[in-house]
């Protein structure tokens, strides 16, 4: 059994004190949590410092906290911010570890079976293991996750019970330790020392935990007793210090012991027999043969190796769950009284609701045609009501809370006033007739003042046509479409801020991360066309893009006033009035946010350049030169991973593997 460390409080490190609306919001949220309120909403306007408020709340209530974001990009940003706020506590990152994922599927109309194909990102896998091990070892944990946290993960009890606990002076033979490591899916490799592997040199065993990336452990034996445990650099073997206790968690989240494995296999065989009878009774002989062949192969692999590709499809039997019972997820690794914070809840809660149905439709086809046993349906994401059953206390965070959140609670804490004194922008409506000439005039005014412009359209064609028109008029403009990758997107935003171009056009510019203080004008074309991007929430989010500049202004081009437009304008005016009154009372003059232009791109490019240089010359290198190149590339890979640029980290990893294969 694992002993958690002594209770450790969260320690928030920041050069700022709460200001504006933050003190009252923090106090209200904390009082509600300590008073036992199950659900509440933090309605925070854009730029009011919601993440800082969330951090203050976490530090005051001292509960393990799960922060859920609706995509990897936003989760990465939040992870970076929380790491800065809590350098002495465990801040973890838990998102899907696939760089590429093609799920297993079957298309009956063309009799096409698509085998599961995926590429696992080693860095993210390491971070996932770090998250689960931290949750089992300590209490001061913040996990920033995407909706991947509601997918099946394996039993936390089996994961914890399988952990190998080691101390100096403990009586255990070297061979007993080796057997224990193999049982928890560690792989012996005396040459290529990586995460989830161990190597043996006489009476010394070196183990590389699945949750680490640079540090491993050296266990030295004296007879059948552990003499010493040392922490070492995995690459150089340099000793970093002695350890008085080491807990090695399994190298995979799906793990079970021998006794449970035999019980699981018996259940799989019983289910297989039942399903074969059903297929044969229906005359589905091809499906029966297919299912028998695939399942018996998997059973043999489970018996011999304790693991098989697609083991998650048998997780119901491995975990000892009943049919239809929800799978274990990351949420089960938390203690009962943990806190959940849902960032951009109007988006995230919709994702949580939609995950289950899409997954079931695909898997049902595999079951019907004999590719999987019916129990595979229980390897799934949680339904929304199952997610709700895990909730002890929850805070929904959004500038525009959705209907679902509003139905869950009447407790709404507003955070309207910005620490900078910035006001919500003025909004005006202009007719669409002659909008191009009118817009061009407004853009030129901003260019003269050294400011930037966002334009949001409804269709790709209109965005492309408008881009061409503005280019012909001599405007430096770019169009950001959905095919652009994360790194390119970051580069475009950076170039806009630096003034490489002055106008950015897009269909959905209300997405997270598009916060550019230099933008003083947001133009919304076809504002009267009701729909997802032109409903009240969409309009408020888009209006918020101009709230980082003291001269922020929004123009809606429309031929009529829709209910959504009116509500968005009224809400913006309400917030603006509150902000103006606060500024007047406290003598605050709004100042445009001074935000550093983070040079993520140049750092990534420097790493990329080193990788390219090594790739160009490695064939002519000597063996020792290649070893040096590998060391440098591994450092570059870590650098890219710390910047959360996992695509680049994966490319560097592949190059390292190529170099190693040459020796």
From Swiss-Prot:
Residues 31-271 form the Helicase ATP-binding domain. One of its GO terms (biological process) is nucleotide-excision repair. The lineage of its organism: Bacteria, Bacillati, Bacillota, Bacilli, Lactobacillales. The UvrABC repair system catalyzes the recognition and processing of DNA lesions. A damage recognition complex composed of 2 UvrA and 2 UvrB subunits scans DNA for abnormalities. Upon binding of the UvrA(2)B(2) complex to a putative damaged site, the DNA wraps around one UvrB monomer. DNA wrap is dependent on ATP binding by UvrB and probably causes local melting of the DNA helix, facilitating insertion of UvrB beta-hairpin between the DNA strands. Then UvrB probes one DNA strand for the presence of a lesion. One of its GO terms (molecular function) is DNA binding. Belongs to the UvrB family. Residues 627-662 form the UVR domain. Forms a heterotetramer with UvrA during the search for lesions. Interacts with UvrC in an incision complex. The keyword Hydrolase applies. The beta-hairpin motif is involved in DNA binding. InterPro entries: Helicase/UvrB_N, Helicase_ATP-bd, Helicase_C-like, P-loop_NTPase, UVR_dom, UVR_dom_sf, UvrB, UvrB_inter. The gene is uvrB. ATP binds at residues 44-51. This is UvrABC system protein B. It is found in: Cytoplasm. One of its GO terms (cellular component) is excinuclease repair complex. A motif (Beta-hairpin) lies at residues 97-120. Keywords: ATP-binding, Cytoplasm, DNA damage, DNA excision, DNA repair, Excision nuclease, Helicase, Hydrolase, Nucleotide-binding, SOS response. Residues 435-601 form the Helicase C-terminal domain. It comes from the Bacteria. SUPFAM superfamilies: C-terminal UvrC-binding domain of UvrB (SSF46600), P-loop containing nucleoside triphosphate hydrolases (SSF52540). HAMAP family: UvrB. The keyword DNA repair applies. Its main location: cytoplasm. PROSITE patterns: HELICASE_ATP_BIND_1 (PS51192), HELICASE_CTER (PS51194), UVR (PS50151).
């Amino acid at each position: 059994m694992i002993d958690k460390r002594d209770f450790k409080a969260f320690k928030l490190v920041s050069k700022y004190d709460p200001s504006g609306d933050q003190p009252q919001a923090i106090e209200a949220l904390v009082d509600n949590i300590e008073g036992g309120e199950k659900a509440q909403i933090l309605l925070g306007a854009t730029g009011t410092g919601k993440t800082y408020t969330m951090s203050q709340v976490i530090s005051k209530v001292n509960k393990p906290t799960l922060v859920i974001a609706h995509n990897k990009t936003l989760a990465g940003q939040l992870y970076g911010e929380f790491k800065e706020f809590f350098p002495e506590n465990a801040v973890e990152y838990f998102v899907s570890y696939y760089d590429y994922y093609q799920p297993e599927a079957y298309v009956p109309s063309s009799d096409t079976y698509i085998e599961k194909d995926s590429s696992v990102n080693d860095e993210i896998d390491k971070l996932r293991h770090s998250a689960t091990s931290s949750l089992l070892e300590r209490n001061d944990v913040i996990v920033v996750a995407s909706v991947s946290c509601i997918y099946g993960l394996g039993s936390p009890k089996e994961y914890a019970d399988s952990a190998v606990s080691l101390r100096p002076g403990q009586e255990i033979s070297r061979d007993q330790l080796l057997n224990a490591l193999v049982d928890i899916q560690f792989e012996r490799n005396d040459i290529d020392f990586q995460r989830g592997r161990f190597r043996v040199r006489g009476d010394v065993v070196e183990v590389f935990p699945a949750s680490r990336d640079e540090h491993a452990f050296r266990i030295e034996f004296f007879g059948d007793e552990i003499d010493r445990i040392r922490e070492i650099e995995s690459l150089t073997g340099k000793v970093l210090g002695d350890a008085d206790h080491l807990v090695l968690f399994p190298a995979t989240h799906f793990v079970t012991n021998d006794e449970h494995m035999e019980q699981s296999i018996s259940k799989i065989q019983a289910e297989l027999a039942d399903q074969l009878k059903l297929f044969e009774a229906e005359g589905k002989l091809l499906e029966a043969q297919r299912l028998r062949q695939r399942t018996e192969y998997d059973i043999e692999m489970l018996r011999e190796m304790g693991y098989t590709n697609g083991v998650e499809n048998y997780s119901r039997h491995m975990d000892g769950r009943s049919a239809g019972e929800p799978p274990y997820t990351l949420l089960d690794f938390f203690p009962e009284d943990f806190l959940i914070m849902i960032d951009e809840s109007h988006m995230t809660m919709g994702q949580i609701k939609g995950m289950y149905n899409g997954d079931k439709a695909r898997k049902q086809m595999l079951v019907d045609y004999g590719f999987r046993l019916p129990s595979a349906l229980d390897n799934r994401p949680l339904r929304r009501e199952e997610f709700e059953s895990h909730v002890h206390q929850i805070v929904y965070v959004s500038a525009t809370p959705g209907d679902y959140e509003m139905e869950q609670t009447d407790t709404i804490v507003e955070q309207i006033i910005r620490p900078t004194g910035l006001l919500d922008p003025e909004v005006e409506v202009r007719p669409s007739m002659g909008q191009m000439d009118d817009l061009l005039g407004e853009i030129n005014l901003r260019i003269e003042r050294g400011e930037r412009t966002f334009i949001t359209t409804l269709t790709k064609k209109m965005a492309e046509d408008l881009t061409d028109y503005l280019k012909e008029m001599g405007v430096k403009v770019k169009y950001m479409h959905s095919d652009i990758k994360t790194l390119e997107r970051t580069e475009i935003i950076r170039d806009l801020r630096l003034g490489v171009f002055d106008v950015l056009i897009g269909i959905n510019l209300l997405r997270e991360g598009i916060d550019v203080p230099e933008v003083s004008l947001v133009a919304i074309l076809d504002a009267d066309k009701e729909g997802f991007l032109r409903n009240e929430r969409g309009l408020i989010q888009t209006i918020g893009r101009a709230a980082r500049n003291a001269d922020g202004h929004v123009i809606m081009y429309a031929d009529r006033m829709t209910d959504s437009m009116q509500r968005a304008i009224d809400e913006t005016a309400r917030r603006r009035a509150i902000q103006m009154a606060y500024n007047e009372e406290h003598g605050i003059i709004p100042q445009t946010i001074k935000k550093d232009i983070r040079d993520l791109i140049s750092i990534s490019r420097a790493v990329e350049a080193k990788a390219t240089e090594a790739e160009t010359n490695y064939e002519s290198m000597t063996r020792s030169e290649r070893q040096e190149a590998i060391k440098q590339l591994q450092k570059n890979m870590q650098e890219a991973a710390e910047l959360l640029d996992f695509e680049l980290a994966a490319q560097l990893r592949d190059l390292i593997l190529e170099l190693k294969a040459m020796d």
